[in-house]
Amino acid sequence: MTAIAPVITIDGPSGAGKGTLCKAMAEALQWHLLDSGAIYRVLALAALHHHVDVASEDALVPLASHLDVRFVSTNGNLEVILEGEDVSGEIRTQEVANAASQVATFPRVREALLRRQRAFRELPGLIADGRDMGTVVFPDAPVKIFLDASSEERAHRRMLQLQEKGFSVNFERLLAEIKERDDRDRNRAVAPLVPAADALVLDSTTLSIEQVIEKALQYARQKLALA
């Protein structure tokens, strides 16, 4: 009998710190890593590259079904490869982020990408980063964590990130964009952004990233020991 690889799902809104937490957990446990948000960003970028309308579900489904994407972990960094090209930086632009949130609202697009996401489940285990990992993609995951933070704190973190990269940003505008995206993600008809019933809800608003990692790893190790 083939062993089923365990999965730790990390869900939550944009800017809560999921990416940093997932990389740290994957390194600590030596597990595979899936950035599901990157898959939607890659699809959005592929649509922009191929001049496919991101507002058209009919046009997006074939593209999603044949999306050539893979993840390569190098020296602790996750490289996102689209059609043989490293697009790790390109998918992180605000234009692609907004388009990704839009394409994620279509039920048939999400269905087309489900199989690709589930294919990342391999031994010794998988850390899955997203918005519906614990509720839709891996509902049988033995460990589920919902990482949250206030919209103000997430806007502040994003502002610091952008400033470090040399960008001039307006906090109020950034906060408005985050609130708008939260509203869209939490109220969409398919796979809305909500914690799984059996998830640990971890609020990172007043915690350092080291504290978040410590709490998440402690919880995961306890749950996996019982599984």
Curated annotation (Swiss-Prot):
Its main subcellular localisation, reduced to a broad class, is cytoplasm
Q: Which UniProt keywords apply?
A: ATP-binding, Cytoplasm, Kinase, Nucleotide-binding, Transferase
- The yes or no answer to whether the keyword Cell wall biogenesis/degradation is present is no
List the GO cellular component terms.
cytosol
GO BP annotations, alphabetical order: nucleobase-containing small molecule interconversion; pyrimidine nucleotide metabolic process
| UniProt cross-references to InterPro entries, sorted A to Z | Cytidylate_kin, Cytidylate_kinase_dom, P-loop_NTPase
Molecular function terms in GO for this entry?
ATP binding; CMP kinase activity; dCMP kinase activity
Its Enzyme Commission number(s) read: 2.7.4.25
Q: Where in the cell is it found?
A: Cytoplasm
Family statement drawn from the similarity comment of this UniProt entry: Belongs to the cytidylate kinase family. Type 1 subfamily.
Q: From the Swiss-Prot or TrEMBL record, give the protein name.
A: Cytidylate kinase
Organism whose genome encodes this protein? Shigella boydii serotype 4 (strain Sb227)
